[in-house]
Curated annotation (Swiss-Prot):
This is Histone H1-II. It is found in: Nucleus; Chromosome. GO terms for molecular function: DNA binding; structural constituent of chromatin. Residues 149-171, 179-232 have a biased composition (Basic residues). It comes from the Eukaryota. It comes from Glyptotendipes barbipes (Midge). The lineage of its organism: Eukaryota, Metazoa, Ecdysozoa, Arthropoda, Hexapoda.
Amino acid sequence: MSDPAPEVAPAAPVASPAKAKKEKKPKSDKPKKPKAPRTHPPVSEMVVNAIKTLKERGGSSLQAIKKFLVAQYKVDVEKLAPFIKKYLKGGAVVKGELLQTKGKGASGSFKLPAAAKKEKVAKKPMKATGEKKPKAAAKPKKAGEKKKSIAKKPKAATATKVKKPVAKSTKKQAAVKPAAKKAAPKPKAVPKPKAAKPKKEAKPKKAAAPKAAKKPAQKKPKATKKPAAKKA
């Protein structure tokens, strides 16, 4: 009889390549790096600032805008070129932020509208008033100093009030002197009317005496003739 064949151990199951990949994925996951902050303002703001500072009558071209961005903000214009063109083609012109004076699309020239210029000019005085506010706050301090000086003035006023009665007494003395001077010339005028009065009284006395003596002398002979007529 032949010996029985030895039993063969079952082979271990081989892991599939798909499962191996799934196990490796958690190991490959790494925390994402935070995005670096921008070193320049938005593209729209940079383009508007470029057109504003260039102040070209016919408008600023795409090349002129790029040169300004490189000089002013030191950015990579090649990376920002698609964003600049996109802003110039659609957003800026459609929204009314820019006016296209020449060409079509991003290849033309662009200019700021008149309304945008007026708004920017109106905003400048607001900044000026904001800067002046701290100066206005400093003024009350000067007013406080003036109040102190005003408080000191009444002391000087009291001193002057004491001196005023002295001035009044001097004025009274000065007023008494002209009164005495006016009283002195009065006795000089008194003898003049005395000389005039006796002249007027002497004239009527001479005229009245002769008239009264002549009239009764003429009437006496008429009264003696009447008794002679009765005797006849």
